[in-house]
């Protein structure tokens, strides 16, 4: 009899192996032995700032926000994670403690791999190293774009960019074209680098003007 948890682990390893392909059967067995799957309720932390990064994570189900606190006591959402995206590994490769925090935006399931195990596989399999090199490069490019948008665009432009980012990453519901991610007004303001009151007012203006998200 195969336990449900074992089945989930095998399915996750299979999905990860497809992204890192080609992997040998021995490498897949290493991942299967190392993987740990954990469920998180909405608003629960996956990791906190100043924690020691010892595990690499991939989101299996749900949505997660990565954010950082500023000097003014306001949080800034760096990005939102969707299923089958990796996170929580940059600090390890930079030999740093976590500078950000990760919290579940809704009930979520996360798979964990020990970073030492992944690094060992990276040394043995060039395709895994190349995957993360491309992954980090893509994130860096997106971060550059976000920096320009948040520092040079006006309030309406910043909020519009945030809404388009969410739609492109998470999609929208077919019946009414609403976003397939539910953010609080505070989180949307944080993603757009503005106060909550400005976000509410700008959203109201968008609604009154009957504006729609289209990428």
What do these predicted regions represent?
Residues 162-166:
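Short amphipathic alpha-helical elements of helix-turn-helix/winged-helix folds
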Residues 119-123, 142-152, 170-174:
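Short helix-to-loop capping/linker segments positioned immediately adjacent to catalytic or ligand/cofactor-binding
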Residues 27-28, 79-141:
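Cyclic-nucleotide recognition modules
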Residues 19, 44-106:
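Cyclic nucleotide-binding regulatory domains
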Residues 168-215:
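Phosphate-/nucleic-acid-contacting segments
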Residues 29-30, 46-50, 173:
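Short loop/turn motifs at secondary-structure junctions and domain boundaries
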Residues 1-42, 86, 91-93:
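Cyclic nucleotide-binding regulatory module and flanking cytosolic helices
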